[in-house]
């Protein structure tokens, strides 16, 4: 990766980039509250773009392009780039940077909040992600009607490690289990804080996220709903998570909805609705032999087995 980058970037190019960044720093102050930490190392920037394996026919979505250090490299390889930028100052600087160049017409800048923006079709996503939207960004990509073929995403190191964590790891959590259901995640590189201007307080990592195709035949909201319950306390038993009054209230409500949709009636001889739902939960946990397991030790197959068993008795999570 380093050798390929050296062929493309001479010392003169790096000096020009540094001068531009110093100019920007004097023009306006970076807003770190918006996650504005500009990637300044050209070798890292080129490495990120290379890992995306962009085809000449690809439309690339870039989230948070900033001053365009990644953007200009993506434009060299992609058919088009759609850059979503929240800060008008950054958008203006990026516009100036490509103005009058051969790639100017290949760039579309969408000004606004990524999480509130309706996205066009795109093949690849590349992002030096504002860390405060890391989790929402991942799930927005996963839930796109036509998800990207691949996403190359820069995250805070600890967040990236949570995406990669396996059952039994200390960082394994609901995020790990949820994302790994829908996508394959691999680690690409570590990026030190000194590669950014201004330097963030934490180290970063770049991950490659490939959404599974075909998509697993599981309802996203049902899967997410189950995980929210079992991971409330990942080191407690799964059965403990179902003893919460709040959880029971939700599941009772969902069960009533299930009965109404199927024109079924509650069997009054079995007690109250609460008793009926509790009995179903206890039965499922016993029959699956998962009641005494800890979510932090369970894998995808365990959770799928649990979800299927609950559905079989009419218990739903969304």
UniProtKB/Swiss-Prot annotation:
This entry's Enzyme Commission designation comes to 2.1.1.183
Classify the main location. cytoplasm
Give GO BP annotations, semicolon-separated: maturation of SSU-rRNA from tricistronic rRNA transcript (SSU-rRNA, 5.8S rRNA, LSU-rRNA); rRNA methylation; rRNA modification
Q: From what superkingdom does this record's organism come?
A: Eukaryota
Give any Gene Ontology cellular component. Answer: cytoplasm
Enumerate the GO terms in the molecular function aspect: 18S rRNA (adenine(1779)-N(6)/adenine(1780)-N(6))-dimethyltransferase activity; RNA binding; rRNA (adenine-N6,N6-)-dimethyltransferase activity
How would you classify this enzyme at the top EC level?
transferase
Q: List the keywords (alphabetical).
A: Cytoplasm, Methyltransferase, Nucleus, Ribosome biogenesis, RNA-binding, rRNA processing, S-adenosyl-L-methionine, Transferase
Q: Which InterPro entries does the protein's record reference?
A: KsgA/Erm, rRNA_Ade_Mease_Trfase_CS, rRNA_Ade_methylase_Trfase_N, rRNA_adenine_dimethylase, SAM-dependent_MTases_sf
Quote the record's binding site residues for S-adenosyl-L-methionine: 37, 39, 64, 85, 113, 128
Known role = Specifically dimethylates two adjacent adenosines in the loop of a conserved hairpin near the 3'-end of 18S rRNA in the 40S particle.
Say which family it is in: Belongs to the class I-like SAM-binding methyltransferase superfamily. rRNA adenine N(6)-methyltransferase family.
**Protein name per UniProt:** Dimethyladenosine transferase
């Amino acid at each position: 990766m380093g050798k390929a980058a050296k062929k493309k970037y001479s010392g003169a190019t790096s000096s020009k980039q540094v001068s531009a960044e110093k100019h920007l720093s004097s023009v306006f102050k970076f807003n770190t509250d918006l996650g504005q930490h500009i990637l300044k190392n050209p070798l890292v920037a080129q490495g990120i773009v290379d890992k995306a394996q962009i085809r000449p026919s690809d439309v690339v979505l870039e989230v948070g392009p900033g001053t365009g250090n990644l953007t200009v490299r993506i434009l060299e390889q992609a058919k088009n780039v759609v850059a979503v930028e929240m800060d008008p100052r950054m958008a203006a600087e990026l516009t100036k940077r490509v103005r009058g160049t051969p790639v100017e017409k290949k760039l579309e800048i969408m000004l606004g909040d990524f999480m509130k923006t309706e996205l066009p079709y795109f093949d690849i996503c590349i992002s030096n992600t504002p860390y405060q939207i890391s989790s929402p960004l991942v799930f927005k990509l996963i839930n796109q009607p036509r998800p990207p073929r691949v996403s190359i995403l820069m995250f805070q190191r600890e967040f990236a490690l949570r995406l990669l964590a396996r059952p039994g790891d200390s960082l394994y959590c609901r995020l790990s289990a949820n994302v790994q259901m829908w996508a394959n995640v691999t680690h690409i590189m570590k990026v030190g804080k000194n590669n950014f201007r201004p330097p963030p307080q934490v180290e970063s990592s770049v991950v490659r996220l490939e959404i599974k195709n075909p998509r697993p035949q599981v309802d996203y909201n049902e899967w997410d709903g189950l995980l929210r319950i079992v991971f409330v306390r990942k080191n407690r038993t799964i059965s403990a998570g179902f003893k919460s009054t709040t959880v029971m209230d939700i599941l009772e409500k969902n069960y009533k909805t299930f009965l109404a949709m199927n024109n079924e009636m509650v069997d009054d001889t079995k007690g109250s609705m609460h008793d009926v739902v509790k009995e179903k939960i206890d039965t499922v946990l016993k029959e699956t032999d998962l009641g005494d397991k800890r979510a932090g030790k369970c894998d995808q197959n365990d959770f799928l087995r649990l979800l299927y068993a609950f559905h079989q008795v009419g218990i739903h999570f969304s």
